[in-house]
Amino acid sequence: MNRQLKTFAKYILKSSFRRQIEDLLDRCGEHSVNVPAHRERSIELLTRQETDVGVFSDYIAFLPAIECAIRKGHIPVVDRKTIHNTFLSNYADANTWEFYFEQPCSVGLDDLNNDSDEVVRSYSSANVPVSLIDCRDEATVQYWRQFARRYIRFTPELRQQLAETERELFPAGARVLGVSIREGYNKLFQMNSKIAVGHPFQASTEEMLSQAKQRLEEWNCDRLLVTCQTEETVELFRRTFGERCLCVERPRYTYEALPEGERAREAVRKTDQRQHELDYIKEIYLLSRCTSFLCSKNSGSEAAFIMSEGYEHFQCFELGLNR
């Protein structure tokens, strides 16, 4: 119990939250890439060593790294070219961060000048948390939401696509309950995969359905958006809620065929990787636009929470980590 209290206590103040991030980032290391004779700009290349992660795992890992770089007086440049994300491995010559996001300060890898830019590289760790879901201090939550809106911006083309998707899917004036389900995590846990170690346990589909029935009425919502990975979950929610159930139309697996672990790496190489991640981004963005939100803890839920302007009602199932 004392350990739990200590865990929650660290989120009470923005300053203590930031100090923890700084300590973790310091351990990640930083090394010099270019030292010009006459420096005009200080550039920090932000890199991740983790490769088997989704776009929103990058989002919540790079967010504190961007803030840390800016406070050091550096111009942050997110680099997903030097170490690629497996889920976008078909694009070896591209900085895949820029498929979906603008650079924080509008400076990219192609803009660097060896004659005048001092360049250092730092490595963002998966263990650096921006866990606003755990935060009980509203000022801290608003600080990071505003920071994220300023420095992690979707590209103009993607912003337009997301706005169109919202208009097409959400009826005007609808009060929407967002429900985030990640069946793949639970399949990993059942497989006892080493990849699942350190990941948060997820509420089952049945538990989320039960909660959604209760919260839809209790929180006065007239529509429900379900984001998920399997065909069975979509069918279950549509049978239960009928026309009130909304979802992004995208390719999904059956639960039995759902590839996880090593099979996921192989499967993703055969897909339209950019479209796969784009569909995921649409889902998480729409969750951020919901009236209320019901989820388990994962990087997509964290990102939706950060991108949102706040929810009338919010419930996250925190079931601990797989050790």
Give residue spans per PLM region.
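Boundary detector for helix-to-coil junctions that initiate low-complexity/charged tails
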Residues: 1-14
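Secretory-pathway glycan-assembly enzymes, especially type II membrane glycosyltransferases
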Residues: 17-209, 213, 218-219, 223, ...
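Short, flexible/disordered intra-domain loops and linkers
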Residues: 51-52, 188-203, 255-277
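A donor-sugar binding/catalytic signature common to diverse glycosyltransferases
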Residues: 63, 280-322
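Conserved beta-strand termini and adjacent loop/short-helix elements that scaffold enzyme active sites
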Residues: 79-81, 227, 247-251, 316-319
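Short glycine-/acidic-enriched loop or helix-start segments at secondary-structure transitions
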Residues: 88, 235-237, 304-306
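Catalytic donor nucleotide-activated moiety binding site of glycosyltransferases and closely related
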Residues: 180-187, 216-271
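A short, acidic, amphipathic alpha-helical segment used as a generic capping/interface helix at domain edges
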Residues: 210-212, 276-282
